[in-house]
Amino acid sequence: MGIVMKKMVLVAAVLAMTAGSSFAADMAVKAVKAPPPAPFDPWDIAFGSAIMNDYVFRGVTQSNHKPSVAAYFEPRYNINKDVQLYVGTSFESISFPNRAAAEVDIYGGIRPTFGMFAFDFGVWGYLYPGGTCFNANAFPGSGLPGSSAGCVANADPITGGLPINGNFAKKDASFYEGYAKVNVTLNDMFQIGATEYYSPNFLNLGAWGNYASITGKFTAPSSTFGSSGIGMYVSGEFGRQWLGTSDRFYGTQIVGQIYQFGIPEPSYNTWNIGVGFTYKVFTLDFRYSDTNLSKGQCNAFTSDFTASSASPANVSLINPGGFGSNWCGATGIVKLSADLTAATNLK
């Protein structure tokens, strides 16, 4: 009986140790259990600023080839990980023919993503407050859009300050565009895309505008600059800006001339290519931009207030004065920007 009792005690001890080990193991697993995931926060805000030596929009300088600053603020709402709603506003310093104080943009849209395809649909409004009208023919009762005594007075090259090039400018150049964009991420290094913008009254010229482009981007491997955290990319765009016929304000005003009551605004091609370097929230971009507009076509399209010399080579039915503008030619752009989001950078 003594031997049997000893065996029973030994078995009981082993069972107790085994049970204790299992319980301890369970306790250990429970002790390192991952915490529940943080609740999904659909709201975010993107914001940033930039400084550049020249503000160029679709191949045409908006700052008279002078430095410009910009800033933006964009609240976002993520319906889910693949659909984002957004609204935003931005500010750019400019030097426009109508002497507008600044460019103020208001925009909004939706960004759905399907795998490698990222879409963007929205409406963009371009506002140019503080402008002045210049047109010696836009006297009250002339029938020209935006006519006023001020238009005539401002157009005087002595008292109004307009160079003696005869160019016209409406007080308000504001307009809006609807747009659709797609970006295709082929892999970690290559992206291609396409854009489409349409306005029924581009730059308030009275002419419709349609812009379409194709884009491409190569992002260098993250190891290109070792462990420095510096990134690099090369990107480019080729686009076409189509334009309709202006209203009477921008006609040649030459009695009997075919374009007296409005000119066919010159459609054109534009392209840019550049290289950029990124570090944390900063991007330094070096870019070349150009168009196929002649100096005479550029003057007719932009009403460049700095155009001061005429040439027979620039004379045409839409530019009878023969003045030429360099606002649409080849230019180099250096831009330093900072881009942040609340979800990523403010936590």
Q: Where are the predicted features?
A:
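Cleavable N-terminal export/targeting peptides
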Residues: M1-P42, T341-K347
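Short glycine/proline- and aromatic-enriched beta-strand/turn motifs that initiate or cap beta-hairpins
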Residues: D26-K30, P37-N78, G88-S95, T341
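Transmembrane beta-strands of outer-membrane beta-barrel proteins
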Residues: I45-S49, A71, L85-T89, I106, ...
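Residues that define the transmembrane beta-barrel architecture of outer-membrane proteins
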Residues: W43, H65-A71, A100-V104, D172-G178, ...
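Outer-membrane beta-barrel "beta-signal"
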Residues: G324-K347
